[in-house]
Each structure stands twice: as C-alpha cells, then as structure tokens.
Amino acid sequence: MSPATVLDSILEGVRADVAAREALISLSEIKAAAAAAPPPLDVMAALREPGIGVIAEVKRASPSAGSLATIADPAKLARAYEDGGARIISVLTEERRFHGSLDDLDAVRAAVSIPVLRKDFVVQPYQIHEARAHGADMLLLIVAALEQSALVSMLDRTESLGMTALVEVHTEEEADRALRAGAKVIGVNARDLATLEVDRDCFARIAPGLPSNVIRIAESGVRGTGDLLAYAGAGADAVLVGEGLVKSGDPRAAVADLVTAGTHPSCPKPAR
C-alpha cells in the first residue's frame, strides 16, 4: 500500500467535516437552501472580458506555507480586490489546512457584486448544493481528487445549479480527463497537491493541448506582473492569485498592478 499523500490527508479531513455538517443540515435542507438562493452570476462573461483576468483569493493559510495572513474582515479584503479590478473573488472554505470557512464565503458574497468562487476539495454532491446555498457562482473541482465517473457527475451537477466549474489539473493526463468530462474552464495548478512541489513550467506544457474554446486559468506561482505576463504568453485567459495578494501591504494596489499588466496592449493575447 502506497503512503498517503498530502492530498489524501486533506481529503480525509474534508470527508469528516462534510459528514459533520450534513448531520446538522440534511441534504434535502441544503438543496432547498440552494434552490432559494439568488441566481448565480455569469462567470463565463467575466472570464471572456478583454485582457488577462485576475481571480483574487481570500486565503489565510496553506499546507505548503502555513499561516499567510490574519484576515479579520474577509469582506473588506474582497471589496479591496473588487476595487482593484479583480473579475472574480476566490474564497477558501476548507477549514483544517487553509483555515477557511463558509462564513467567509457568506461575508464575501454579501460584500461584492462580481462572481465568487468557492475553493475547496469537493468530494460529495452535498458540497455542490452547499456552495450554491452560500452564494457561490463558481466551484472548484480537482481532477486528482475524483474518479472519472465522480468528476463527470460533479461537473454535471454544478452546471445544473447554474454555477460554472473550475476544473483543476496538474498533468496532461488530468487535462485529458477534464476535457472528456466536458470541462469548459480548466485551471492548471503549478503545485502538485500530492507533494506540494511547484512546477512553474506546468502551464506552458499543458495549455497548448487545450482546445481554443476552453477557458484556461493559471493557478499558483503568480508573484507579480512578470509571472502574469509569462502565463499570458503561454495562453492564459486568467490567473488565480492568493498568497501574493494577502501578503502584500496594499491588496487593492497589488490587484490593480496585475489588472493593468493584463489589459495593457503589449500583453500577449490568447489565441482563439
């Protein structure tokens, strides 16, 4: 039996936490709450705006870096991101390793008028309805965390609720699985969730193999405008940035710098 990876350990905790939440609020109750929520915003329209989009993340901690920032007011941070020009706000809701919560998602959804992404490790259909009930417009699905049949059903369920799935991959094989499942938005994570090692060339290897009608998002490794431009040159439509923003002294200005670079006439445009 192979030793457990970092991802395996995270998923074990997530399953336990989902079971605990479902014991308090049943699947039928969370489905009803999702159905009663305001309709989701148009994520695809936001991602297709001109230039390289910035998805700015509310992120307190990570397994690789530990504690990143004390975020006493996630709503205030999200508003700063929106004021800086972010197209989408990503909210970590995993509790054990990332110190996030559904309360953070609620606070951010109430604070901004742009789409919100729930970033978590989705392993149960319950979490999809939960995301919608708490106002998410977009939901992360990690290929490495799901068998193919589960990936297909999770993607279908996400879209059936009107949300957009961000399907995350780290290898060419995972990208192929994402495409076979019907992914319309694929995020290439430079970080291997099994080992936490970062491969900054990962996006440049995988993106050329993706069809032109698929939205391509570069995740991890964006430390500034130089990284954004490099990802743009490799075909990115958007970048997802967390650590670099929460550790900056001025998150609004940090987002604005990235947005300016991503919309500058000299910024490479994705081939379409």
Swiss-Prot record:
The keyword Cell wall biogenesis/degradation is assigned to this record: no
GO molecular function terms attached to this record: indole-3-glycerol-phosphate synthase activity; phosphoribosylanthranilate isomerase activity
Reactions catalysed: 1-(2-carboxyphenylamino)-1-deoxy-D-ribulose 5-phosphate + H(+) = (1S,2R)-1-C-(indol-3-yl)glycerol 3-phosphate + CO2 + H2O
Pathway where it operates: Amino-acid biosynthesis; L-tryptophan biosynthesis; L-tryptophan from chorismate: step 4/5
Keywords: Amino-acid biosynthesis, Aromatic amino acid biosynthesis, Decarboxylase, Lyase, Tryptophan biosynthesis
InterPro entries documented for this protein: Aldolase_TIM, Indole-3-glycerol_P_synth, Indole-3-glycerol_P_synth_dom, Indole-3-GlycerolPSynthase_CS, RibuloseP-bd_barrel
Family, similarity comment: Belongs to the TrpC family.
Protein name (record): Indole-3-glycerol phosphate synthase
Lineage, opening ranks: Bacteria, Bacillati, Actinomycetota, Actinomycetes, Mycobacteriales
